[in-house]
């Protein structure tokens, strides 16, 4: 009888969990490349604004260019979300403040000052987007690893597009699965006659919290109609996924994830259930690695992997598809 624990396929010691300097460096570079890629639309909008605003001879002339009024409002510090709460008079006042306090004092350089202020607030918007992007990239990496494991095992799968908000249109594996991971909300497969459906970012009623990864014992077609996420006995696995690569925030991310996983175990235990729990993280520092290792040894945490280590992620995904 095989008594080997699932994590022992890819973790031999606590040190295997830790993120190395080289892995941090690669993670930061990948994040910087993604940030550069995502900044392109912001820069192009600023260039378009400069062209449109260049017909103005004075800052006040900008008020008569109707097609740039939203951009002027943005440059004044009013976000798209905030402007919904403002009257037309409020908007005009904000734009006038921009002109009188910043553009007019800039003299002949008022166009450059406008573009600078526009980009300043666009940068805030990009920063907010990038804070969410680490989690999205982590999910994409995990998804690609799961479908690769399914492909290697020659197991057909279906996938759910996150843009389908009804969560009912499960599609067969496409011939060309390029960038499928970008939009996958869920993946489903059958192994040894057992139906498995994995979903991302689901609010689990039993714990009243959002959980990053949930694996269900059900066919994909019944997941939404039968509200499977409301049936505790259908949960096979729940997991936390932390894609942030900054070591300074690693311990805090683990504390948040650990609290969530403990709550999950407690709530399911109250129902006499014990689904598997996993933790996957990109930034794993020494102290948290020891805590994770202790939980793996005791069995409170079923499996874990460092997201920056391809072999670990691959091994974990191979285990997931065989549950």
From Swiss-Prot:
Mg(2+) binds at residues 212, 240, 242. GO terms for molecular function: DNA binding; metal ion binding; type II site-specific deoxyribonuclease activity. The record marks 81, 131 as: Interaction with DNA. GO terms for biological process: DNA restriction-modification system. The gene is bsoBIR. It comes from Geobacillus stearothermophilus (Bacillus stearothermophilus). This is Type II restriction enzyme BsoBI. It catalyses: Endonucleolytic cleavage of DNA to give specific double-stranded fragments with terminal 5'-phosphates. Keywords: DNA-binding, Endonuclease, Hydrolase, Magnesium, Metal-binding, Nuclease, Restriction system. Pfam families: Endonuc-BsobI. Homodimer. The keyword Cell wall biogenesis/degradation does not apply. Its EC number is 3.1.21.4. It is an enzyme of class 3 (hydrolase). It comes from the Bacteria.
């Amino acid at each position: 009888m095989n008594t080997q624990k699932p994590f022992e396929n890819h973790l031999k010691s606590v040190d295997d969990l830790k993120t190395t300097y080289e892995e941090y460096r690669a993670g930061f570079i990948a994040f910087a490349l993604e940030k550069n890629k995502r900044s392109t639309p912001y820069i192009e909008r600023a260039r378009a604004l400069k062209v449109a605003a260049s017909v103005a001879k004075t800052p006040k002339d900008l008020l008569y260019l109707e097609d740039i009024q939203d951009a002027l409002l943005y440059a004044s510090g009013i976000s798209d979300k905030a402007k919904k709460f403002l009257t037309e008079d409020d908007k005009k006042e904000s734009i006038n403040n921009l002109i009188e306090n910043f553009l007019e004092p800039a003299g002949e350089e008022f166009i450059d000052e406008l573009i600078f202020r526009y980009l300043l607030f666009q940068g805030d918007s990009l920063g907010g987007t990038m804070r969410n992007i680490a989690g999205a990239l982590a999910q994409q990496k995990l998804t690609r690893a799961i479908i690769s494991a399914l492909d290697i095992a020659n197991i057909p799968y279906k996938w759910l597009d996150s843009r389908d908000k009804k969560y009912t249109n499960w599609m067969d594996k496409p011939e060309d699965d390029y960038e499928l991971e970008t939009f996958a909300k869920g993946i489903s497969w059958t192994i040894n006659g057992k139906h498995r459906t994995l979903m991302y970012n689901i609010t689990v009623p039993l714990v009243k919290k959002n959980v990053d990864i949930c694996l269900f014992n059900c066919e994909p077609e019944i997941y939404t109609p039968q509200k499977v996420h409301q049936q505790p006995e259908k949960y096979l696995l729940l997991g936390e996924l932390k894609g942030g690569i900054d070591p300074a925030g690693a311990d805090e991310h683990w504390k948040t994830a650990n609290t969530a996983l403990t709550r999950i175990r407690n709530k399911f235990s109250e129902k006499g259930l014990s689904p598997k729990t996993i933790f996957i993280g990109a930034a794993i520092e020494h102290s948290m690695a020891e805590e994770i290792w202790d939980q793996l040894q005791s069995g409170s945490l079923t499996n874990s992997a460092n997201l920056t280590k391809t072999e670990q992620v691959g091994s974990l995904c191979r285990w997931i598809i065989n549950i």
